[in-house]
Regions:
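Sec-dependent N-terminal signal peptides
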Residues: 5-15
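A short, active-site helix/loop in glycosyltransferases that binds the activated sugar's phosphate group
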Residues: 136-145
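N-terminal secretory signal peptides that target proteins for export/translocation
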Residues: 1-2
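Structured loop/turn residues at beta-strand edges in well-structured enzyme cores
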Residues: 98, 111, 154, 171-173
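Short, glycine/charged-enriched secondary-structure capping and boundary segments
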Residues: 44-47, 92-95, 117-121, 145-148, ...
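Bacterial Sec-dependent signal peptides at the C-terminal "C-region" and cleavage site
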Residues: 13-26
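Core dinuclear metal-dependent hydrolase active-site scaffold
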Residues: 23-92, 158-208
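Active-site metal-binding motif and surrounding structural segment of the metallo-beta-lactamase
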Residues: 62, 67-132
Length: 208
C-alpha cells in the first residue's frame, strides 16, 4: 500500500508543477486523497502499513480523489465521489465559499462512487448536481438502488460521457475521459485529461 501511495504522490506532484504556473487566477488541482478504496488504515488491516496509523490520526489518508479549481470563477469540480466525500467536499469548496459544479466518476469500485450517498435527502438533499459518467457507469447508477433514487429525486443529474470526447467546463477548462484497463465488473474504467489555458494534467486513479 505504501508503495502505491508514494508513486501516486510523485506522479500527481509532477503534473501539478506543470498544470499551475503560480498565478492566483490560474486553474489548479487539489489532491484530496491518496489511499485505496478503504482509506488508510483500512478495516481489519494488521499489516505494517496500517499498524502505526490506527493510533495516529496524522497518519490517516483519505481515499484517492482530486479537485479541480478555477479561481477566476470560484468554480470547483471533483473527480470521484469517495467514502471521504464530506471532508473532501469541504476542503475543495473552502467551507462552501466556492461553487461546486459536479463530479466526474472513473468507475464502479467502492472507493470511487459511494460518496454520492451524501448528495441524497438523508444528508445534503442536493439539487441536480451534475454527475459525469461513462455509459456502463451511468447504467449502473440508474438501474441499482440506492443510487437510482438520487436520479429519481433529482439530487443528481447524470451527464453522459463518451470515450475521448471532451467536455468544456468553462472558458478556461476542458476535461476528456479515456478508457484504461482495470477490473471492470460493473462499469468501464477511465482516466481523465484536464486541460487549462496553458498546461494539462492526466489523472488515473486505478489501472492494471
Amino acid at each position: 500500500m505504501l508503495n502505491k501511495y508514494s508513486i501516486f504522490v510523485i506522479i500527481i506532484s509532477i503534473f501539478l508543477i506543470g498544470f499551475s504556473t503560480g498565478k492566483n487566477d490560474n486553474p489548479y488541482v487539489v489532491v484530496l486523497g491518496i489511499a485505496q478504496d478503504g482509506g488508510a488504515p483500512h478495516a481489519a488491516c494488521t499489516k505494517d502499513c496500517c499498524v502505526d496509523r490506527w493510533d495516529n490520526p496524522q497518519l490517516h489518508h483519505m481515499v484517492s480523489s482530486i479537485g479541480i479549481v478555477d479561481p477566476s470563477t470560484d468554480e470547483v469540480w471533483m473527480i470521484d465521489a469517495t467514502p471521504d466525500f464530506s471532508m473532501q467536499l469541504n476542503t475543495l469548496t473552502m467551507d462552501q465559499k466556492r461553487l461546486f459544479k459536479g463530479v466526474f466518476l472513473t468507475h464502479a469500485h467502492i472507493g470511487h462512487y459511494t460518496g454520492l450517498m451524501h448528495l441524497g435527502r438523508e444528508v445534503m438533499g442536493a439539487n441536480q448536481i451534475p454527475v459525469y459518467a461513462m455509459p456502463k457507469m451511468e447504467a449502473f447508477l440508474t438501474k441499482n438502488g440506492p443510487w437510482s433514487q438520487l436520479v429519481e429525486l433529482q439530487n443528481i443529474d447524470i451527464k453522459s460521457l463518451q470515450n475521448e470526447n471532451s467536455v468544456q467546463l468553462n472558458k478556461n477548462l476542458s476535461i476528456t475521459p479515456f478508457l484504461v484497463p482495470h477490473r471492470d465488473e460493473f462499469s468501464e474504467t477511465v482516466g481523465y485529461k484536464i486541460e487549462g489555458p496553458n498546461k494539462s494534467l492526466i489523472f488515473i486513479p486505478d489501472i492494471d
